[in-house]
A protein has these predicted regions:
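Glycine- and other small-residue-rich loops at beta-strand/loop junctions that grip anionic moieties
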Residues: 13, 44, 101
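Repeat-blade elements of multi-bladed beta-propeller folds
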Residues: 22-47, 108-113, 118-125
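Long, low-complexity segments enriched in small/aliphatic residues
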Residues: 85, 94-98, 104-130
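Extracytoplasmic/lumenal domain signature
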Residues: 1-24, 31-39, 51-98, 129-174
Length: 174
């Protein structure tokens, strides 16, 4: 928003359609980074969908969007359109799918941190899998009802991983 007029300057939606409950309410870190030898005022976020985003907070330009966990619902984010490229594994409209991350997300309410001296962002990440039974109800606005869904199906609890990842903010790589 423009602080003087209140008008919308730009917006970005990390999970268009959001058929997996990947809300993006996780906090946003503001930073000044040098990207491609150019100083940029950026915002960084690791929402539930498994991608770490770096966006120019002045222009709204998507600078990077890389996986921080092995998400299966999308292969990558198309940097020209800014949209995630959904995979067949992520489409649960016709058959039950096991999808990573589950609705709990790859990163939830746990705070992430950044270190301006090293350029690293630290993300407390999870890798839960979720069972999504077939439904097309989620595709119809206002038609969703609660249903039984499961997370971490068939995964040995000893192998359920929570990890703190250190990601280089300038590149999005971990």
């Amino acid at each position: 928003l423009d602080p003087d007029t209140g008008r919308l300057k730009w917006h970005y939606q990390v999970t268009p359609g959001d058929n997996w409950d990947y809300t993006a309410t996780q906090h946003i870190i503001l930073a000044d980074l040098v990207i491609g030898s150019k100083p940029r005022k950026v915002l960084m976020q690791a929402p539930k969908n498994g991608f770490f985003y770096v966006i120019d907070r002045v222009t709204g330009e998507l600078l990077s969007a890389d996986k921080y966990i092995p998400a299966t619902w999308a292969s990558h984010v198309d940097m020209k359109t800014g949209r995630p490229v959904e995979t067949p594994e992520g489409d649960w409209s016709k058959e039950t799918k096991i999808i990573v991350p589950a609705a709990f997300g790859g990163h939830n309410w746990h705070p992430m941190a950044s270190n301006p001296q090293t350029g690293l962002v630290y993300i407390p990440a999870m890798q839960p899998a979720g069972i999504y039974p077939p439904s097309t109800e989620h595709l119809q606005t206002g038609k969703y009802t609660r249903r039984e869904m499961f997370w971490n199906p068939g995964v040995d609890w000893n192998n359920y991983t929570n990890t703190v990842y250190a990601i280089l903010a300038q590149t999005g790589g971990n």
